[in-house]
């Protein structure tokens, strides 16, 4: 077993093995973000789903009201006037078939890929490259659309795509550890509501199993699920 550094031992000692009230958990997250670089705030949520069944898969988006604290590079694959439209709307990388060819050759200088529906048959050719990186455009994620200005604006403003992995766990960055605990709570609440709103039709039994938050290099902190779900928006704002 790897030996923990003194810094990590001290951080782990601050966290009790119990569910914390949401705001208390986020205050503790900030307190344990002591790395020498700007840490992100992460949520790790275990759901009662088995994604090997199509009716128990979760892939959707959430608009984080307080943003992500990150600058993301958006790429768009379109044709004709939609290329000009995407550039004018602030896309960082724009192209048609030639961009697909560049991706096939290894180009990956973007964090998010949006495509117009008419380009999806061509985009499918690089699905094996994009899929494992979580970059394959999807209607569910809002990344297959003709309304490019709105999609670009939303993702740059803090809209985040997420999915449950094969174990039914959702991993999401929901802000920076430098955000106030109150702002992190607003974002975490928005994430919880999106997960509830998009509950897979085949999910049976207890949907929410556990919620943990952590700074990038910090210990995991358990959040009281019921307290988070019962929290009113006015309290979180």
From Swiss-Prot:
Protein family membership: Belongs to the universal ribosomal protein uL1 family.
InterPro entries: Ribosom_uL1_bac-type, Ribosomal_uL1, Ribosomal_uL1-like, Ribosomal_uL1/biogenesis, Ribosomal_uL1_3-a/b-sand, Ribosomal_uL1_CS
Entry function: Binds directly to 23S rRNA. The L1 stalk is quite mobile in the ribosome, and is involved in E site tRNA release.
Keywords of this entry: Repressor, Ribonucleoprotein, Ribosomal protein, RNA-binding, rRNA-binding, Translation regulation, tRNA-binding
SUPFAM superfamilies cross-referenced by the UniProt entry: Ribosomal protein L1 (SSF56808)
CDD domains listed in its UniProt record: Ribosomal_L1
Name assigned to this protein: Large ribosomal subunit protein uL1
Organism superkingdom: Bacteria
Natural source organism: Thermosynechococcus vestitus (strain NIES-2133 / IAM M-273 / BP-1)
One example of a Gene Ontology biological process annotation: translation
Assembly notes: Part of the 50S ribosomal subunit.
Species lineage: Bacteria, Bacillati, Cyanobacteriota, Cyanophyceae, Acaryochloridales
A molecular-function term among this protein's GO annotations: tRNA binding
């Amino acid at each position: 077993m790897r030996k923990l550094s003194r810094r990590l031992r001290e951080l782990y000692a601050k966290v009790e093995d119990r569910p914390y009230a949401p705001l208390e958990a986020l205050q503790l997250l900030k307190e344990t973000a002591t790395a020498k670089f700007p840490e992100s705030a992460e949520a790790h949520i275990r759901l009662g789903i088995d994604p090997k069944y199509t009716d128990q898969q979760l892939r959707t988006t959430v608009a984080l009201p307080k943003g992500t604290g990150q600058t993301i590079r958006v790429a768009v694959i379109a044709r004709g006037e939609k290329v000009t439209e995407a550039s004018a709307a602030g896309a960082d990388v724009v192209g048609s078939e030639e961009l697909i060819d560049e991706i096939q050759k290894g180009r990956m200088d973007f964090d998010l890929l949006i495509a117009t529906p008419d380009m999806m048959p061509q985009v499918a050719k690089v699905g094996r490259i994009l899929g494992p990186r979580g970059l394959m455009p999807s209607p569910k994620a809002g990344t297959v659309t003709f309304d490019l200005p709105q999609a670009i604006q939303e993702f740059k403003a803090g809209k985040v795509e997420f999915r449950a992995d094969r174990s039914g766990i959702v991993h999401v960055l929901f802000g920076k550890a430098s955000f106030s605990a109150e702002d992190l709570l607003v974002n975490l609440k928005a994430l919880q509501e999106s997960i509830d709103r998009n509950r897979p039709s085949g999910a049976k039994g207890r949907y929410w199993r556990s919620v943990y938050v952590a700074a990038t290099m910090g210990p995991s902190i358990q959040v009281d699920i019921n307290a988070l779900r019962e929290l009113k928006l006015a309290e979180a704002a």
